[in-house]
Each structure stands twice: as C-alpha cells, then as structure tokens.
C-alpha cells in the first residue's frame, strides 16, 4: 500500500500516524514544506520518501509532488493530512489522481457549515437556525425571530477563528464595517457546554473506536479574548452522544476516517431545539481533534489511537491494539504568558507526579490552546478538579 501523508512534520505529533502505518508495512510517502535536514529524526524514520515543496498552498507544486511519487512508486492508495486546513486540497488531489477516499464533492459537505446543517437534519439531530450574512436589513429580520445574541462565522473555516458574538445592532453594523473576503453565516445563539464524539470509523461508516471530550462553554471567547483553556477526555462516552454521533457518521457517509463531532449540551431550554441536558449539533470535523488531544485519548484509554487508525486503513478492523485497559479522565490546561501563576511546574510536579505532558504550545496553535500546557490523567474527577485549581491559581489569589 502506498500512502501519501501531507505535512508529516506539523502538527509535531502527527508523525505518529506515519510511524504506525509504516509498522503495518505501508509505504508512507511524505509531502511537506519543511526542509528535509530540519525534520525530526522520528519523522524521517517514519517515511519511505519525503518530497519537499516550497509551499503547501501551491496546488501546482502539490500536484507535481503527487505525480512524481505516483510515477516512482505506482498507484497511490491513500492520501491524507488529517488536518482541517488541508481537507479540501487533499480531496482535490484524490479527485485528480483517482485516489481512494473522500473526493472534492464529498468534502464540501463536511467543511461548509451551511451544508453540515442539512446532514445533521438527515441524521435526526437538532441544529441551530441560520442564514447567510447578506445585509444589515435582512440580518435584522432573522434576529427579530431568534433574538440577540447571534453568532457569525465563516461558512468554511478552521476552529473558532474569525467567529464573533453579535450582541446588539451596533455590533452588527461594526461587523459590516469590515470587508469580509469569504461568505459568513449567522446562527442563533445556543446556551450550552460543548461536548464531542471523537473516534475512527471503518469503511462502512461504523464506529471502530470512540471517546468523549468536554470543553469550555466558548472556544470563540478563548480565541478572541486570549483566555486560558481547559478541557478533558471523559472516562466513558454518554449514550446519547454515541447514538447521535453514530447517526451523523452514517448521514455524512464518512468512511475510514478519524472524526471529531461537536455538540452542545443545553444548559438552558431552547424552544424548538430541546430541554436542559439535551444535545444540539454544533459542527462536524472529519479529522482528529486538535492539538495533543489524540495523545490525551491514549493516556485516558491506555491504548494507541494512532495504531487504531493504521489498522483501520490497512485491515478495516482493529487487530494490533488491546482495547481492554483501565480508563481515566485526562485533563488539558493551557496557561497564558500574559498571566502570572502562583505555582511553577516544579511545584505542581511534587504534588502530582503523574503529569503526562508539559510543554510550550506552538505559536500556530496557541490562540486556541494556550502558550504553556499541562496534560494529566486521573482516576477520579474530584482529583482532576483539584489539579486544575492548582494549575490555574494566580499569584494574587489566596
């Protein structure tokens, strides 16, 4: 099997996908913009060959790279970046070279937020009302129906970038003062906590492996206001999340992919959507959850999600991972450089020696993930909450 992996050096934990594929005797061929001599040795060792391009943004360069690798190694069986930013380009390359996997028409369905709505409805999952941002007058008609606040965000975009809460007519006018280069949609505001259904599905859109994360109420506010970020991997997947997530995968006809499906769990009843505790669709992301979340899943479930991915790609089932291991909660806490914290890493390590990771976050991901992060796992949620309290404590706090 020939597998082209796009950008194997970034994010820096993604070499693990290549390494596990190679372990399964896959010919892993990398394309990236990092000079070969600057690649980490782990990335180099996970690849059969690496083709450097000047820019991953240049489709002509990417096309030539794939053509070269196909000429040298024969038919390309898979091409993937597992990165939201490159999903459409991945799909176009698959389409142009007739490579297995989601083609460009398929990917539009799960990268466009407006298209997502129709598939959520098909899956029987409630979804927030929306419209395209067209003019102040037409937007006000929508707001008169759903009330303030409303959320505006690019119809196609990554994470919470360029997402805003419109609280009044002045905010709306201010939004239109800027020349937005891409289509925006406006959604009714949902009061709820964000929770996700993450995992890997097989070639028949069946869940092969899954987990659940619980996030802060607003990633948008974290990005826009440079706030701290904290979220955790749950010990178990709630049944309503599993049921809704499984139906969404079938509705989108997702095959042999890592997925990250986001939902609101309502904290306030919303007419037409649900009662407190019900779930409402947020977004579909057909790639792994961001940052080091795949590693957090590994820590929480005592397994290797990268190997699960490789097994599904190669065998369409899990054969190299023992799924019967103890499960834990796993917390991520991202600190901000602008804040002064009471306890250093050394202080925290003395009390919590089982910290799994402590590093600086790359600048490219820091807006949503913080500048310095801690990842730790716990048998009990109460211990996780105490750890979070210590890590977040500021110098001026009692």
Could you say what each language-model-derived stretch is?
Residues 1-105, 381-382, 386-396:
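ATP-binding N-terminal substructure of ATP-dependent carboxylate-amine bond-forming enzymes
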Residues 103-114:
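A short, structured active-site edge motif that brings together acidic residues
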Residues 276-280, 286-336:
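C-terminal structural cap/anchor segments
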């Amino acid at each position: 099997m020939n597998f082209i992996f796009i950008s194997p050096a970034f994010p820096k934990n993604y070499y693990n996908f290549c390494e596990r594929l190679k372990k399964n005797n896959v010919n892993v061929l990398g394309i990236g913009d990092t000079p070969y001599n600057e690649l980490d040795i782990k990335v180099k060792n996970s690849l059969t060959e690496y083709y450097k391009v000047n820019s991953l943004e240049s489709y002509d360069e990417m096309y030539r790279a794939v053509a070269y690798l196909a000429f040298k190694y024969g038919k390309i069986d898979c091409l993937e970046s597992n990165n939201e930013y490159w999903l459409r380009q991945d799909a176009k390359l698959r389409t142009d070279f007739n490579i297995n996997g989601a083609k460009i028409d398929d990917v539009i369905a799960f990268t466009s937020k407006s298209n997502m709505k129709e598939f959520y409805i098909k899956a029987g999952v409630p979804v927030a009302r929306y419209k395209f941002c067209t003019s102040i007058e037409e937007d006000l008609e929508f707001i008169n129906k759903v009330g303030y606040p409303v959320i505006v965000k690019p119809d196609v975009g990554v994470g919470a970038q360029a997402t805003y809460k419109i609280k009044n007519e002045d905010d709306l006018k201010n939004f239109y003062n800027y020349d937005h280069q891409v289509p925006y949609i406006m959604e009714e505001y949902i009061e709820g906590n964000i929770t996700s259904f993450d995992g890997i599905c097989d070639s028949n859109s069946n869940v092969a492996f899954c987990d659940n994360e619980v996030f802060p109420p607003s990633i948008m506010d974290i990005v826009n206001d440079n706030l701290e970020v904290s979220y955790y991997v749950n010990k178990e997947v709630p049944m309503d999340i599993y049921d809704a997530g499984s139906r969404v995968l079938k509705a989108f006809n997702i095959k042999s992919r890592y997925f990250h499906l986001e939902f609101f769990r309502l904290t306030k009843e919303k007419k037409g959507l649900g009662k407190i505790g019900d779930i409402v669709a947020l977004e579909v992301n057909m790639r792994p959850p961001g940052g080091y979340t795949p590693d957090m899943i590994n820590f929480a479930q005592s397994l290797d999600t990268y190997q699960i991915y490789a097994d599904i790609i190669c065998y369409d089932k899990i054969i190299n991972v023992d799924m019967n291991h103890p499960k834990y909660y796993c917390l991520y806490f991202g600190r901000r450089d602008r804040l002064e914290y009471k306890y250093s890493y050394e202080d925290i390590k003395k009390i919590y020696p089982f910290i799994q990771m402590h590093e600086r976050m790359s600048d490219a991901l820091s807006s949503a993930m913080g500048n310095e992060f801690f990842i730790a796992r716990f048998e009990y949620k109460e211990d996780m909450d105490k750890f979070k309290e210590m890590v977040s404590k500021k110098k001026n706090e009692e």
